[in-house]
Structures are given as C-alpha cells and as structure tokens.
Amino acid sequence: MSSPVTAQRPPAAPPLIAVDAMGGDHAPREIVAGAVRAVREHGLRLALVGRSSELAPLVAAEQAARELPIVHAEEALAMHEGALAAWRRARSSVAVGCKLVRQGTAAALVSAGSTGGVVSTATVRLRTLPGVLRPALALVLPTTPTPTILLDAGANADAKPEMLVQFAHLGAAYARVGHGIAEPRVGILTIGSEPGKGNKLARRAAELLSANATEDRLDFRGNIEGHDLLAGLVDVVVTDGFTGNVALKSVEGAVRFAFDEIRAALTSSPLARFGTLFQRRALRELRTRFDSETYGGAVLLGLNGTVVIAHGASRAEGIAHACLLAHNLVVGRITDQIRRGIAGVSRTPSWLHRLSAPEE
C-alpha cells in the first residue's frame, strides 16, 4: 500500500519515463493502457520498453503510436524470477529500461515486474549513489493526516545497523520530495516503544540514530511498534527488508480481511443492504484510500536513477499512477536530495560497501 499520487504541474519539456511493458500479471495489455492514460490524462512523456511485435498492435489499437514510442527489448523477466535475473536476462525489458536511465535518455523506470528481479537488475545496472550501502524499497502507508513511509519493504532481507541509519535518510528525503513533509519524524520498527527494546539490529540502529540525530539533522522519535504502523505517529518507519515485508503483508491481509467482513455484514439482511445505500459514498472513499490501484507503488531509493515498482497485479489505473509518481519524483530531484543527505552521514566502515547484491 502507498499514498495516493497527485499531479504536479509538468514542466515545459516533461522528463521521459521508461515503462517496462512486459512486467506484471496483466502485461502487456494493461501496461499499455495505463501508459496511454498517463500520457493523455497527466501530460506525461513515456516510452514503452518490450517486444515491439507484441506492443505495436496494442499501441495502434489505442491510436497512440505518435504518443508512445517503443524501445525494443528481446526478453522479459518472469514474475517468479528473483535476484539471479540481473545476470541471466541481460536483454530483458527491465535491463534495457535501466540502460536508458543510465545513459540519460530516460529520467526514470517504471515496472510492475518481479520485485526481486527489478531490484537486482536495477542495482547491478544503475549502481548505488556514492556512499549508499544498499538501496531500500520504500512505500507509503495510507495514514492520516499525512502518509507514513515504510522502508525497507523487501529489497534487503538482511541488514546492518549502519544500513538502517542510511534508510532513515533515504526515507526522509522521500518524505520531503514526494509528500511535502518539511521535517519528517523518523522511528524504528521494533517490539516495544521503550528505549532498549528489540534485537541487536534494532537496538544498535536506534543508538546510532539517537547519537547523531542533531548532527545529521534528523528528527528521530525512537521505537515504533507494529500496531502503530497506521497510527501516523511518525512519517518514516525504518526496518530491515525481511521485517518490513512481513509487516507490509500483514497490514495488507488485515485490511483485506476487514473489508471482507464489512461486506458480509452490510449484505447480511435486507435492512443492512438498505442502510448501505446511505453510506455508499463513504465506503467507496474508504476502499479507494486502501486500493493499490489508486497508488503509485514502491520506490527503490539510493540508486543513480529513479525506479518505481508498481504492484504486480496492477491494471491500467495503477500503472498510470506509478508513472505519475515517477514523474513527480524526477521533477522534485529525489536523487539529488538523497545524494546531498547521504554525503553528510557516510561514516560507515569500508567493509560494508562490499556486501553482496540483494537477496531473492
């Protein structure tokens, strides 16, 4: 889940966004349809990356040949492919999209493909920014009044305390650029709100964040428990990718269960169905707020380029919003913000820079 995306005014010459047209459960048809919506409804400039023989007829059917150029890529990542795809699929649509970003032809990449495959391919081909140990997958939870950013949501199953400190700065930069939060509050996800709670990783990361909060210009608020993820107590929640992904899936499952129970209760009797008529608008707004189709997706932070990973089940609306999110981050110069933020906090042991690529 993540926060609804709103459009910023496009510049005179919108940045080009490369869209992986072969990634996702409903590729390429829904990807093409979403790209068309992004171009026509939001004025974005996109290029589809994938097998031209499959994409050209779909683009022609949308009468969008002049609006959506196609960059041919021979291969596509399967949804089950993980980290090894970065080496096995050198000619995949994700790899070609990363090449466009690296060359400066495109400003960002959007993909609904396998998260593991996209993360590993982007990390290998774009490389991390100077001083960044590992990229982190960041998404936003639909809290009020402002969204809460959760990272890492699955890019790194294992992490070191120094990595979590960097994740805090990556998330803070995203909060400022993507959501207009001037002074993001940062917390670390653990098993108790009191100082000193949690495993060695959480405790050491909290110590580092507390000790350097003033010098690093970071508003660290301490520990956050799982039941407070949606409470809006902080703007950025930091954890390792294993814990973050479990927390995310737990929240998604709980929300799905709650909506199923609400639906069952509202249709349990004629009187209940009648009462639903008076709550239809509020229920629709609530569902939209938690529906991944109305959100942009997760952002892979810390690379030499902007990468947005949409939900694998995204249809046209979800893809359009992912493209809009990528556009807004490029316009907000998210990469430069992260580069400046990390430059002042890269006080980490040199051996950490030799950590292996993200796990599957």
UniProtKB/Swiss-Prot annotation:
Pathway: Lipid metabolism; phospholipid metabolism. Its main location: cytoplasm. It comes from Thermobifida fusca (strain YX). Its EC number is 2.3.1.274. Keywords: Cytoplasm, Lipid biosynthesis, Lipid metabolism, Phospholipid biosynthesis, Phospholipid metabolism, Transferase. The lineage of its organism: Bacteria, Bacillati, Actinomycetota, Actinomycetes, Streptosporangiales. This is Phosphate acyltransferase. It catalyses: a fatty acyl-[ACP] + phosphate = an acyl phosphate + holo-[ACP]. It is an enzyme of class 2 (transferase). It comes from the Bacteria. InterPro entries: FA_synthesis, Phospholipid_synth_PlsX-like. The gene is plsX. GO terms for cellular component: cytoplasm. It is found in: Cytoplasm. The keyword Cytoplasm applies.
